[in-house]
Amino acid sequence: MENDLAIETCTLSQDKITLYGKQSVLDQISSIDVSLPVSSITSDRTLKLPITLPSGITTSDISEVSISVTVGKQSKKTFKDVPIKFVNLGDREASSDISTVDVTVYGGEEMLQKIDKEDIIVTADLKGLSENKKTSLALKVSGENRLVDYKLDTSEISVTVTKK
């Protein structure tokens, strides 16, 4: 998508799908992703996109979905003091030089209005870290809304892992 443009709204023609397959596979599915080719969208339009079924699903009641997209000017919104969550900590404790970071979200104004600080997840993966050693770790940021871009103002933190 062009730098000054962003998706304002995105509406599916169908919000439900019936899947057929083994019950054990069906029990593991809560949603179906449809890939939207954002880079090719430069104006308001409706696209028909195929639905790719997960492995183990034999068929579904629909094979494609129409997505209506409206485009607007890109805006940004900064969220202050988003907490950092440590993952793969196990039975250890972690201390770091900072506990929160600022995150700037880029997208359409309407999309940005729907995002709260609680929707943003910043993580530091502690897997494989040695204990009692200060280590620089890259932070990762994500959010539920995948039609916006999340950017960290701080990309690394220093962490020390110790036994509880």
Positions of PLM-derived features:
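Interfacial loop/beta elements and low-complexity acidic/Ser/Thr-rich segments
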Residues: 1-164
